């Protein structure tokens, strides 16, 4: 995928969430089963205390449903929560516990990654997203339902490194990687919508990378979003990319009717 097409895919997604924020929010209200397993791992390893204080960085926080889930599951914990998203309207009206220290940052993460990668030689990761975390690195860095919106393998690698750079030593970095082609119904729809999307946008299939798709929304053919399917080979590659910075604590599939719609990586910062 060329830099120009990658930027276009990001603009496509930015427009999609801006134009469909209300209807999208209505379909994203419940927690995912995979989150519970991540939380259990955090308790078991001691990375997440059941009492006291914990710092959380939520990248692609959307309508704050992860924050709401944590509020229910960690009632005795003082949480310092920093959420990042480029569609702030999704979080409007959401109330979190009064005892929490909450900051929300409006940031186009994908655009930042693409611009940095294409225009600068960044060298080693070290917080290039410019996240102003209070009190240092986070105990839990979570990025759920977002990696599949990041075009190019290199940008996805950089995102994982960025997430780890904001994770404290011994803390957890938890990410989900979408696997839509594991569901026959979703896979069929993805292939059909991609063909329609390419025609609508005047693009050819060769301009996308392996595993890239264009999805519509609620039967409409005038709005598109870029998505990527993660196969086992690419997930293996991401795990290797984290070596030297973090240890793989868990890797599992969860979510969806068959329990395999997302692949999760739980990484402990070295």
Question: What is each PLM-predicted segment?
Answer:
Residues 150-162:
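A short, conserved alpha-helix within the catalytic core of class I
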């Amino acid at each position: 995928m060329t830099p120009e097409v990658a930027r276009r895919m990001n603009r496509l997604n930015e427009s999609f969430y801006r134009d469909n924020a209300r209807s999208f929010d209505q379909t994203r209200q419940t927690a995912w089963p995979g989150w519970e397993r991540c939380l259990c791992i955090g308790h078991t390893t001691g990375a997440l205390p059941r009492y006291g204080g914990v710092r959380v960085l939520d990248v692609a926080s959307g309508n704050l449903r992860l924050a709401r889930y944590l509020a229910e599951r960690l009632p005795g914990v003082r949480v310092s929560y920093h959420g990042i998203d480029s569609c702030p309207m999704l979080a409007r009206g959401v109330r979190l516990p009064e005892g929490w220290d909450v900051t929300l940052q409006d940031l186009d993460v994908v655009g930042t990654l693409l611009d940095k990668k294409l225009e600068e030689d960044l060298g080693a990761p070290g917080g290039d997203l410019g996240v102003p975390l209070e009190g240092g690195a986070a105990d839990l860095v979570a990025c759920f339902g977002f990696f599949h919106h990041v075009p190019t393998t290199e940008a996805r690698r950089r995102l994982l490194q960025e997430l780890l750079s904001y994770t404290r030593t011994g803390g957890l970095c938890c990410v989900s990687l979408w696997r839509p082609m594991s569901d026959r119904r979703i896979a069929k729809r993805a292939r059909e919508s991609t063909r329609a999307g390419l025609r609508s946008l005047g693009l050819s299939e060769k301009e996308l990378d392996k595993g890239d798709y264009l999805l519509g929304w609620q039967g409409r053919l005038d709005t598109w979003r870029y998505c990527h399917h993660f196969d086992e080979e690419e997930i293996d590659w991401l795990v290797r990319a984290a070596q030297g910075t973090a240890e793989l604590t868990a890797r599992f599939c969860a979510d969806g009717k068959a329990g395999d719609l997302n692949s999760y990586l739980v990484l402990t910062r070295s």
